[in-house]
């Protein structure tokens, strides 16, 4: 995902410095070229050899180190950087950067990078230090200059206090870096609505009717759209996975709740991808108390739910692109093509429950992308890769429509 990308990690003097070893390892596993820059104080918390072993690159500390092939090192490395993350960012280094002080390898490199690539800072310090008006003023100044400040978590701190100032987890920092550099931002400025997961229709306070959807495919589409620069709203039912970061999440338990949420979200959407498995039927009446077991059969009277995709197709706005999904057990292409026409879709993603590697629950999928004029069957791919191919197709359709 990060092959060919150069990530600079700036580590300052904080007990949270040890966490960056895990982050460096995560980035290397995604094939990023990682270089760590440390302040002298940071070396009191973690040894440079740790980072050199994990990244395969020399850890840079001294601006005047003579043991390298000659170049103006802080400028040379800044030219290669795709993103810089200063984490943990101490109050001292935050103050230096905010006020133009560049007196060591880390701060001079950040100064050289700030005008040419994203620079992120993750403050980590005692609560009283973080809330000090001077620190807050420096952070606000950095935001005005275009730096991104990753807000600290609240929790138990190394000093024994409880409050704000805890550096976010390695996964959170990793997600921030991915957001900046993992993909080309071809969806920047676009609003994308994605539905995911399964709805649940109550029978009584204990039981409900649902399906096998886990939300993995819809979440993959939402995640990839976010990484490609879109503002994403994810309307989700029950899911076996967590929603991706940096998306607006709207929870919807029933088909009726999802319909209302989708109607509201789709009003100003450029792209709508309806990947949720929504119940076609619901109990006509919901029992107020738990239904007791009894001899003999139980009959439930069901009624149709609103067809959300058909409503979206009937109310599609000019310039809006609508993508649906079709899970079938027979006559895949015929049934999917019929759904495409009936519901006024621009694209439908068809997959068969009978195909190995496709369907619910897994991390892979095998789909066919159908439009009015063509059908393209994709090979077995991860759901992230499938999501990218779906978004690629949507972008192609939008470009063709604008000609």
Where are these regions (language model features)?
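A cross-family phosphate/adenosyl-ligand binding-site feature
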Residues: 1-121, 126-403
């Amino acid at each position: 995902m990060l092959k060919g990308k150069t990530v600079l990690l700036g580590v300052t003097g904080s007990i949270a410095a040890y966490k960056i070893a895990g982050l460096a390892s995560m980035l290397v596993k995604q094939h990023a070229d990682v270089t760590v820059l440390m302040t002298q104080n940071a070396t009191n918390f973690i040894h440079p050899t740790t980072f050199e072993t994990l990244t395969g690159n020399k850890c840079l500390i001294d601006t005047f180190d003579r043991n390298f092939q000659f170049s103006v090192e802080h400028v040379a490395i800044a030219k290669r950087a795709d993103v810089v993350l200063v984490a943990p960012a101490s109050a001292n280094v935050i103050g230096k950067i905010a006020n133009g002080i560049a007196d060591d390898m880390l701060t001079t490199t950040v100064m050289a990078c700030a005008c040419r690539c994203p620079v992120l800072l993750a403050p980590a310090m005692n609560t009283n230090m973080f809330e000090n008006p001077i620190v807050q003023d420096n952070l606000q100044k950095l935001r005005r200059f275009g730096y991104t400040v990753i807000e600290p978590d609240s929790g138990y701190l190394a000093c024994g206090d409880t409050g704000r100032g805890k550096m976010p987890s390695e996964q959170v920092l990793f997600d921030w870096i991915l957001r900046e550099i993992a993909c080309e931002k071809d969806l920047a400025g676009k609003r994308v609505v994605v539905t995911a997961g399964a709805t649940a229709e109550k029978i009584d306070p204990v039981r409900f009717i649902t399906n096998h959807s886990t939300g993995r495919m819809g979440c993959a589409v939402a995640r990839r759209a976010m990484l490609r620069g879109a503002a994403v709203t994810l309307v989700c039912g029950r899911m076996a996975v967590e929603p991706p970061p940096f998306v607006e999440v709207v929870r919807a338990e029933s088909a009726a709740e999802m319909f209302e949420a989708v109607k509201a979200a789709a009003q100003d959407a450029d792209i709508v991808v309806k990947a949720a498995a929504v119940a076609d039927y619901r109990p006509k009446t919901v029992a107020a108390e738990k239904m007791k077991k009894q001899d003999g059969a139980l009959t439930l009277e069901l009624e149709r739910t609103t067809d959300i995709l058909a409503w979206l197709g009937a109310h599609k706005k000019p310039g809006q692109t609508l993508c649906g999904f079709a899970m079938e057990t027979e006559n895949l292409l015929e049934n999917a093509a019929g759904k495409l026409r009936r519901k006024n879709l621009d694209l439908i993603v068809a997959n068969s429950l009978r195909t190995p590697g496709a369907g619910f629950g897994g991390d892979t999928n095998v789909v066919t992308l159908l439009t009015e004029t063509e059908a393209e069957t994709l090979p077995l791919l991860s759901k992230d890769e499938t999501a990218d191919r779906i978004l690629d197709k949507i972008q192609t359709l939008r470009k063709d429509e604008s000609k």
